[in-house]
Amino acid sequence: MKMKVLEAKIIYESDDLEKYKKIISDIFYSFGVTGLKIEEPILNKDPLNFYKDEKQFLISENSVSAYFPLNIYSEKRKKVLEETFAEKFSEDEDIVYNLDFYEYDEEDYQNSWKKYLFVEKVSEKFVVKPTWREYEKQDNELVIELDPGRAFGTGSHPTTSLLLKLMEEQDFSNKSVIDIGTGSGILMIAGKILGAGEVYGTDIDEFSMEVAKENLILNNISLNDVKLLKGNLLEVIENKKFDIVVCNILADILVKLLDEIKYILKENSIVLFSGIIEDKLNEVISKAEDVGLEVVEVKADKEWRAVYFKRK
């Protein structure tokens, strides 16, 4: 079955291109993407061979593209993206932009995406290595092999690296773990590498399920040793509680999920959240305290925050 990908592409012009490239990128990142394609007006290939190959061309526009699974939520996602950018830029006279959407077969673009991804040391211990890159493991490093596809990055975005930093500081030995909104499966893989016993991953998207399965296998993790469940949390998890909950999702969704997460916690459970923009941190903490959690640690990277909670 071919997977489909939705590309959201913004072409923009401004006298301050760097400023708006960052703003556009941060908005896309706030929607949960972990990899972007950024194009600027430069020669796309070797300039020495430009006249020898008529297929070569100049990139003539500034653009930022984000990639999402194409599914039943895509039309809503388009609308929300349009509204978000319109609200941000409607009264800003310093930028002119156009947002368009395109649909592709995932496998048609798999190879072209690979050139944008590299080996990344994302925390003190964890190294994330795309399968097509060579890397010599150093002492004490924990290497995650990833073939993320065009719709996922490799863990270098602050939201993922912050959560991996929190994870490597915990004792996962034989613990039961659930990753809510697993995406590429990177946090499930990290949990297993850190010695977890039972590892569950949930997501509402079939595309994510397939990508996560492939990445688990790449890391020599048998699908019999984990559970991947498609659906909303309490619909797929019944009468099960976990030692550790990890979740890298937008703050607004985290706030809503906490009303469900409270039912899957043990007395001494810990909860590790990321995906929280600085302005939303207090809202997430307040809701977490309402459901019986207390803050142990907050990690920061630029405007992003990750939080370590435990049961009170």
Swiss-Prot record:
Q: What is its EC number?
A: 2.1.1.-
Q: Name one GO cellular component term.
A: cytoplasm
Where along this sequence does the record place binding of S-adenosyl-L-methionine? 160, 181, 203, 248
Specify the enzyme's EC class, one word: transferase
MF (Gene Ontology)? protein methyltransferase activity; protein-lysine N-methyltransferase activity
User: Which InterPro entries does the entry link to?
Assistant: Ribosomal_L11_MeTrfase_PrmA, Ribosomal_PrmA_MeTrfase, SAM-dependent_MTases_sf
| One family name in Pfam for this protein | PrmA
Tell me the compartments it is located in.
Cytoplasm
Presence of keyword ATP-binding: no
The UniProt entry, under SUPFAM superfamilies, shows: S-adenosyl-L-methionine-dependent methyltransferases
- Describe the reaction catalysed, as an equation: L-lysyl-[protein] + 3 S-adenosyl-L-methionine = N(6),N(6),N(6)-trimethyl-L-lysyl-[protein] + 3 S-adenosyl-L-homocysteine + 3 H(+)
Q: Tell me which UniProt keywords the record has, alphabetically.
A: Cytoplasm, Methyltransferase, S-adenosyl-L-methionine, Transferase
Q: Which family does it belong to?
A: Belongs to the methyltransferase superfamily. PrmA family.
> What does this protein do, in the record's words?
Methylates ribosomal protein L11.
Instruction: Cite the PANTHER family for this sequence.
Output: ELECTRON TRANSFER FLAVOPROTEIN BETA SUBUNIT LYSINE METHYLTRANSFERASE (PTHR43648:SF1)
- The molecule here is called Ribosomal protein L11 methyltransferase
Q: What is the lineage of its organism?
A: Bacteria, Fusobacteriati, Fusobacteriota, Fusobacteriia, Fusobacteriales
